[in-house]
Structure formats: C-alpha cells, structure tokens
Amino acid sequence: MDEMIRRAIDESIAEVAVATGSDIYLVEADVRGGGRIIELTIEADKGVSIDQCAKLSRTIRARLEACEENLMLAAGDFELMVSSPGIGEPIRVSRQYLRHLGRKMKVVYLDSEGERKEIEGKLTEASLEGEEPSITIEPVVKGKKKKTSGREPLTLRLADVVKAVVQTEW
C-alpha cells in the first residue's frame, strides 16, 4: 500500500477516534488499481456505527484530496469504501476477540500434531497480552437448547488458530 495512503488512513482513524470518543481501529485495508479503489474494514471494541464509518470516509477523502503530490487523489479520482465486518466474516485482528467474548464461534485450529481440527463453542476468554496470546472456547452441544457438552473448555494459542468465525444465533 502506498505510504501516503496508509498515513492518511492511520491519521484519519486517530482523528475520528478522538472526535467520537471511540476506540476504532483498522481491521483490513485493500488498495487496488494503483490506488483508485480503497476498501477499509474498521472495528471498535463496542461496535462501529454507520455514522463513524461515514465520518471516517469523509475524513480520509479530505486528506487524500488535499494531497498535492498525487494528482489522481487530489482530483478525487478514486473510490473509497469504509465498512465494519459483516456477519460471518472471519476474525482478522486479535483485538476482535475482545468484542466477541461470550459469543458462539466456530474455530479451525492446528492441534499439537499439526492436524486441522474444528471446535464450536462460546468464547469465554481472550488473553491477548504476553508471549503466547490465546483464546478459550467452551464447547456447546448442537441442538435446540444450548448446553455445555460436558467437555472441558479448550484454550488455543492464537498462533494455532487457522480461522475463527462468530456464529449467528437465531
């Protein structure tokens, strides 16, 4: 990603976080077409509102259009999309686990032999500090009533997590 675009994104997120009193952070940035298409996914520990996405979009656009060293950006000749992660999107940044404590998740991980395994259960803990960040999943039995499975909670090192997706509960 172009250094100038990245700087504009980072500075804008910091500005909007202060202005809205939130803790928004960047989950993913996808810049394609030589900077003509910029897609950002943002998150906050307590969720992201449409107003925050719109404010961030306006702030980034203004910063990029004020950039005289890139004529394409200065002319506003680019597409900018700012959104929050949708339902069923995998966790991309470890900080997202904090937002989903208490929710049901499906986690694909590597066991001690390096084999892929899957567990579905409630995220009960997220320890993101220290040398080995980890999450703890309490397995649940599939069925009409959500019950614990009788299996012990499983603590996984984040380094072993291949994919984690929050499950919707209807």
UniProtKB/Swiss-Prot annotation:
Family annotation (HAMAP family): RimP
Gene that this polypeptide is encoded by: rimP
Signal sequence interval, chain numbering: none
Stated name of the protein: Ribosome maturation factor RimP
Function: Required for maturation of 30S ribosomal subunits.
Coiled-coil positions: none
Annotated organism of origin: Chlorobaculum parvum (strain DSM 263 / NCIMB 8327) (Chlorobium vibrioforme subsp. thiosulfatophilum)
Listed GO biological process terms: ribosomal small subunit assembly; translation
The keyword Membrane is annotated on this UniProt entry: no
Alphabetical list of PANTHER family matching this protein: RIBOSOME MATURATION FACTOR RIMP (PTHR33867:SF1)
UniProt xrefs under NCBIfam families: PRK14641.1
Transmembrane segments annotated in the record for this chain: none
Localization terms from the record: Cytoplasm
Keyword NAD attached: no
UniProt similarity note: Belongs to the RimP family.
Keywords: Cytoplasm, Ribosome biogenesis
GO CC annotation, single: cytosol
